[in-house]
Amino acid sequence: MRGLGALLIGLFLLPGVAASRPAPRVLIDYTPVFDRLCSRAVGTPTPPGASEEIVTRLEEFRRLWAHSGPRLLETAQAITDQPYGFRETVAAVHVCPGFASMSLPLLINVRLFLRATNGRFVDRPEMFVDTLFHETLHTYIRGILGAGDKAASRSALLRKYAEETLVTRNHLHLIALQSEVYRRIGQPEMVDAARAADLPIGPDYVRAWKIVDTEGAQPFVAELRSAAR
């Protein structure tokens, strides 16, 4: 038994073992109650027909993710050789203007994807998957590097760019890994699509993409691979 135990421990320490573990399961759900309460709190009503459209299209959103999302998460893990720190998570979709999409709690604002809101990505279903992938990567990368000072202690690149805004720094490793995933699966056009979706959000995102362009994605990915848990 002692020999078997040593063998099992050795297997978990071998490179590539993390990549063989399953990616986390991402569930997608919706409750109109959140939109009602949130819209009331921010003083902006839910767009007419938006809640009804989400209810009608919820299964569509789930199918979109089921078709492409797991492959993206698995590829990210294969690239970093780091396991996910969670097995399952729930993404709550909503349309409240008070909350953008975020990773913790995992909220996906679907205004951009609805006909009721004249969303710019209503005919780009892959961008819903990209948004959910983006937010899930935030949690994944926090689990690898940690947050704040802990992340900086593990990343020479974060120390190099310590004067940048928190939003910019939080997106450096993410943009690099996201881009590498799309290249790995043969969808380099999605790198351009993700960039085009990010840039209108604000200058912090513009700066993050510029830094990753300057440094290249590989140095950031290498830090994720070498980070000790």
Sequence positions of predicted segments:
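Short active-site segment of divalent metal-dependent hydrolases/proteases
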Residues: L137-I141
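Long, charge-rich low-complexity segments
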Residues: I211-R229
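Post-HExxH zinc-binding segment in Zn-dependent metallohydrolases
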Residues: I144-G146, A151-D204, A208
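Bacterial N-terminal signal peptides
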Residues: G5-G16
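Auxiliary, metal-adjacent structural segments of Zn-dependent hydrolase domains
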Residues: R21-P22, T46-P105, I185
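Active-site scaffold of zinc-dependent metalloenzymes
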Residues: Q82-L132, R142
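N-terminal low-structure segments adjacent to metalloprotease catalytic domains
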Residues: A19-V55
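Second-shell loop/turn segments in exported
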Residues: T56-A66, T117-V122, M127, L158-T165
